[in-house]
């Protein structure tokens, strides 16, 4: 899976979990500030990313993932 495929899948997960339109999402979008996520939304999003990409994201790392690009980068690095 290449970076573009990971990005597309992350965008799809955000759309399904957070109820936003795909065209509202940018890589620099912050989950809370730009996409309206609360803490529960963010936890559910991290869990879905773990399931979809078969990666484990420890809580201390999850706390550092606050925007879309950080999520993509984390998954890309975890899949290396």
Swiss-Prot record:
Modification type O-(pantetheine 4'-phosphoryl)serine: residues: 39
Pfam families for the chain: PP-binding (PF00550)
Pathway: Lipid metabolism; fatty acid biosynthesis
GO molecular function: acyl binding; acyl carrier activity
Cellular component aspect of the GO annotation: cytosol; membrane
Post-translational modification: 4'-phosphopantetheine is transferred from CoA to a specific serine of apo-ACP by AcpS. This modification is essential for activity because fatty acids are bound in thioester linkage to the sulfhydryl of the prosthetic group.
InterPro entries: ACP (IPR003231), ACP-like_sf (IPR036736), PP-bd_ACP (IPR009081), Ppantetheine_attach_site (IPR006162)
Keyword Lipid biosynthesis applies: yes
Domain of life assignment: Bacteria
GO biological process, one term: lipid A biosynthetic process
Residues in Carrier domain copies: 4-79
Subcellular location: Cytoplasm
Residues forming coiled coils: none
Keywords: Cytoplasm, Fatty acid biosynthesis, Fatty acid metabolism, Lipid biosynthesis, Lipid metabolism, Phosphopantetheine, Phosphoprotein
Protein family (similarity comment): Belongs to the acyl carrier protein (ACP) family.
Functional description taken from the UniProt entry: Carrier of the growing fatty acid chain in fatty acid biosynthesis.
Protein name: Acyl carrier protein
Taxonomic placement: Bacteria, Pseudomonadati, Chlorobiota, Chlorobiia, Chlorobiales
Gene this chain is encoded by: acpP
């Amino acid at each position: 899976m290449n970076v573009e495929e990971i990005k597309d899948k992350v965008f799809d997960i955000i759309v399904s979990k957070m109820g936003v339109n795909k065209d509202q999402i940018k890589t620099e979008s912050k989950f809370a500030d730009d996409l309206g996520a609360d803490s529960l939304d963010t936890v559910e999003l991290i869990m879905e990313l773990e399931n979809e990409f078969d990666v484990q994201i420890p809580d201390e790392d999850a706390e550092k993932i606050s925007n879309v690009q950080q999520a993509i980068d984390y998954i890309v690095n975890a899949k290396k």
